[in-house]
Amino acid sequence: MFPGGRYFTVVCAFSHRNNDDPIMHSRHPGLSHNHTYAGNRSVDAFSTSASLRSGSTTCDFPQDASGYWAPTLYMGREPIQPMAVLVYYVKRTTADVVPFPADLEIVAGDATARKAQRKSIVSWGCDGFGGSKRYALIPACAKERTLDLRVQFPNCWNGKTSDSPDHKSHMAYSTGGKCPASHPVAVPTMLLILLYLPVPEAAQVVSGRFGAHADFMNGWDQDTFSTFVAGLNY
């Protein structure tokens, strides 16, 4: 049952859009496709975890100045702004979870995908969140429903590096509540959920109809985050 374990939730508003990506194209402004940001208000191509912590946030916890972003959803040439962004931090391992390293950067999902991604990682739905039917492509939601994009981040860390050349291989997904030997450190699963008003099926994210994904750059106050994460183990 969603979300699949003990959890705490951060609720964030839309912040801004730009053509930057401080993880994939660090220090190269304008090189990325358009991104929609929530959380930290100042994310750009030059952002780092340290710089984020000195900024402000759209999230309901002021101690969370992290950057959360995803490719912008478009209907034709019109960008569509999410109504809200939810971030579930969930314990999904049998081992206790520990906080992320202070400068962790993660990408989940594949911007270059040209076929359906695993729906356990990237999916769309019409119920906003929870156990609704999941789709590989944007569904035609009824007017009274809420379209959502859900991206699940990996929850096992190699314990050594806060990033990697592909921005993914320092992390892995658990299987049956167990982390692989290559990534033995259990951390919370992040479920990033972007909520939208229903859109026509012709709408798509700028990275392509199958290319939904999301990025995270840690900007938490580490003492606060450590306290929240410790609570997931009891």
Language-model segments: what does each one mean?
Residues M1-S32, T36-V151, N158-Y234:
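Primary mode marks residue(s) on the alpha4-beta5-alpha5 output face of response regulator receiver
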